[in-house]
């Protein structure tokens, strides 16, 4: 199997990480991964909230 190197995996955005986990492990795992993405993908919590939380959009 062709597996991406760890170096390439670290360059993924938070959303790309969640999509990858969804494909690999399923929906529930991806949701749990998203909740702790600041630990798993080294993004800040603010970045994750901007990407994933529709409640955080103040324009609406």
Swiss-Prot record:
Keyword field contains Glycoprotein: no
What tissues harbor this protein? Mainly expressed in shoots, and, to a lower extent, in roots.
Looking at the UniProt entry, the stretches that span the membrane are: 26-42
Membrane topology, as annotated: Single-pass membrane protein
**Localisation:** Cell membrane; Secreted, Cell wall
Relate the protein's function as given in its record. Confers resistance to heavy metal ions (e.g. aluminium (Al)) by chelating them at the plasma membrane of root cells, thus stopping their entry and reducing their accumulation.
This chain's protein is named: Protein CADMIUM TOLERANCE 4
Native species of this protein? Oryza sativa subsp. japonica (Rice)
Which taxonomic lineage is given here? Eukaryota, Viridiplantae, Streptophyta, Embryophyta, Tracheophyta
């Amino acid at each position: 199997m062709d597996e991406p190197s760890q170096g390439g995996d670290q360059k993924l955005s938070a959303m790309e990480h969640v999509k990858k986990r969804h494909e690999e492990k399923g929906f529930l795992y991806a949701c749990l991964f998203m909740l702790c993405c600041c630990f798993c993908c080294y993004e800040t919590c603010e970045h994750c909230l901007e990407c994933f939380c529709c409640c955080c959009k103040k324009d609406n």
